[in-house]
Amino acid sequence: MQDKYSPAEVEKSAHDHWQAIDAYKAVENAKDKNGKDKKKFYACSMLPYPSGKLHMGHVRNYTINDVMYRYLRMNGYNVLMPMGWDAFGMPAENAAMANNVPPAQWTYANIDYMKTQMASMGLAIDWSREMTACRPEYYKWNQWMFLKMLEKGIIYKKTGTVNWDPIDQTVLANEQVIDGRGWRSGALIEKREIPMYYARITDYAEELLDHVDNKLPGWPERVRIMQSNWIGKSTGVRFAFTHDIAEEGKLINDGKLWVFTTRADTIKGVTFCAVAPEHALATFAAKSNPELTDFIAECKLGSVIEADMATMEKKGMPTGLFVKHPLTGQLVEVWVGNYVLITYGDGAVMGVPAHDERDFAFAQKYVLPIHPVIDVPGKTFSDVAWHEWYGDKENGRCINSGKYDGLNYQQAVDAIAADLAELGLGEKKITYRLRDWGISRQRYWGTPIPIIHCKDCGDVPVPEKDLPVVLPEDCVPDGSGNPLNKHEKFLHVDCPQCGKPARRETDTMDTFVDSSWYYMRYCSPNSSDAMVDSRNDYWMPMDQYIGGIEHAVLHLLYARFWTKVMRDFGLVKFDEPFTNLLTQGMVLNETYFREDASGKKTWFNPADVQLQLDDKGRPVSAVLSSDGKAVEIGGTEKMSKSKNNGIDPQAQIDQYGADTARLFTMFASPPEQTLEWSGAGVEGANRFLRRVWAYGYNQAARVANASAFDFATLPEAHKALRRETHKILQQADNDYKRIQYNTVVSASMKMLNTLEAAKLDDSPASNAVISEGLSIFLRILNPVAPHITHALWQELGFAKDHGDILDAPWPQVDPAALEQAEIEMMIQVNGKLRGSIIVAKDADKASIEAAALANESVQKFIEGTPKKIIVVPGKLVNIVA
């Protein structure tokens, strides 16, 4: 055994060993050594995008998963930890353009490198189950599901709004539009309506919402709230304003302007209606109003993202059109509002300035009437400024509302809904913020949509026998539109129905389709004739999912939806895919920058900066190492390329070893909280591992000489050491169960301190206690630092008795070891802590009272005979003087 810790040698040896025995290959229905079924546990990290290199967020995520795997495996579970690649998407196209290579070439090269990085981390991944989203054997089943969902009406086609770059002749994602211009061309972006495919996720809205509350107790409350809010159930009234506006002799929208409101009690306060720029009434009015035409064009340049629209300036323009109020018969002016989405509800809203803050601001801006129709006792309405109580539906009563005066919110809604229903102009309705999922993307690098366009037959689904529709991997995007439109071999095909020349669909699927079910494909790897098979029934639902909070809504919601569709198709037997969810915190680091005269900031990596510290070790100034000139200290932020504050995991592994990187990321913070990077912390983790190795080396002879021993006969000093090791084991085991790995590392450090500090003689008793303590210590530390503990386990001979540490039985707390002949009891005098005493564990009340009264510290605070002495057995003596 080497006397010095060499991470490179230790870790290579461990990797070679694990590879030789195919250590992490998982099988279904695994048995224990007694032939009994092991309990399965499926733990999975959200699959990464193959961007080229792992970042510290990856390291933290996968280490959490790996620690969980190793702990559970030692506890007898049949554990699965797979890995795959979210390999389609826009970043690959951008990188391909920058490097003039096909996205496929860039993607596969990145995957190869990132796999070597994962291997160097010692992750317990079953690579036989690897899936890659851009491989035809995977996306074939995206296409198969698309066709099944199309057949059942769950997928349908309609026009949708996209960002169109007129120079590059391509569709841009919202994040590629900067200040209304294309990120590459700088051209003013146009909103275009094009046919797209949608999935009816709204058909599952109620079930998705119900299951958030009733079937996801193992999810963080924060995520469940985010999902509920995203689904956004609203109970209200949908009703129509009427009109006689006609075009070419036909009433527009059958003479009705439909709106939805959750505040039907304020219907008598309507002073205007606002419609989306794309609404039929807006289009009609614009034909005779050039100014309105320009305004609508301006609106279409804006964002269609709700978050953006919520914060942008609300603008409007009157159409010159009026609709009739369904209850009063009064004419209400119709405006075009840039804040109204055509894709939300009916693309129109009623305006009640007196009781809606947005409408109030809009009315003030454009000098529109404000009519209060709700009164809150003790309050006086004024149209000068908005007050929160104007929107109070809990305490308000209707006023200025005729027959509804005096009614509270619910009474008014019920009465108004009934009257609207009687008129045939409205009804109570439940709506959802959630909208159907647009899965079409006008991009190349994605799953081809399996549709063929025929002039005679229309849109024809690709026959199942012809799947997969294989995406050509030789295209190099140049920014001038989807290269599939120029790929003759892909594009031209015979119609499956009539046999005439036809054309393939060139849109591809949203990459969220890929990530909606990949975790099930891990369970049925290499299944060529089914999307999932019986192996999926064994592993799913997943026991523990691990990923960032940024995926709390879209990915997780789509995965839940996809699972329910698969259930309804008879492919799976469960409702929810992920039983437990852990959202790990971000990894933070310091930021440093210089700002030029124009305000542009240049960011410098922390490794290139030297700090000047004050006498308390706090940074007071910083200079760039290369030129010695000052840089600004920007504070601690999430590691990112934009702030140039990332740390290369591979550099850390090369310098210190994977176990150091793993130990630091687990120790520095609880898994669900943010982790602040610390070079000193990394050094500290490495020092600890060197101590671990040195202790193992120094105790090798003692362990070799250890033999079976009756622990009941141990001397008191040996019992004390054993008691402490088992107390720490008990704590660590509990922390592993709670996924509090930072305190597991603390327990490991405490145990090493305890073992190092033990002053025991060279006797069979000492050898037995140290050997047991060291074997417990190595198993506690193993899930976090598997390489060094594997090496020491082998070198010290523990493998002979317990087998490979991977499958060594988890140490059990010995209740006898925790027993103490004496206990410490605290003493309070008049409610204040004044001292403590050591008494026999079985001491009677009189003995305890006598010992407490004899304590020197206590005697200072009592005069004469105490009024009362209360003994709380095993804990406390309370003296009332």
UniProtKB/Swiss-Prot annotation:
One Pfam family linked to the record: tRNA-synt_1g
What does the entry list as the binding residues for ATP? K641
Q: Does the keyword Acetylation apply?
A: no
Keyword entries, A-Z? Aminoacyl-tRNA synthetase, ATP-binding, Cytoplasm, Ligase, Nucleotide-binding, Protein biosynthesis
Question: Where found in the cell?
Answer: Cytoplasm
Question: Motif 'KMSKS' region at which residues?
Answer: 638-642
Q: Does the keyword Signal apply?
A: no
GO MF terms listed in the record are: aminoacyl-tRNA deacylase activity; ATP binding; leucine-tRNA ligase activity
- Residue span of motif 'HIGH' region: 48-58
Listed InterPro entries = aa-tRNA-synth_I_CS, aa-tRNA-synth_Ia, Leu-tRNA-ligase, Leu_tRNA-synth_edit, M/V/L/I-tRNA-synth_anticd-bd, Methionyl/Leucyl_tRNA_Synth, Rossmann-like_a/b/a_fold, tRNAsynth_Ia_anticodon-bd
Biological process (GO) annotations held by this record are: leucyl-tRNA aminoacylation
Q: What is its EC number?
A: 6.1.1.4
Q: Which family does it belong to?
A: Belongs to the class-I aminoacyl-tRNA synthetase family.
Identify this protein by name: Leucine--tRNA ligase
Organism field: Janthinobacterium sp. (strain Marseille) (Minibacterium massiliensis)
- List the top taxonomic levels of the source: Bacteria, Pseudomonadati, Pseudomonadota, Betaproteobacteria, Burkholderiales
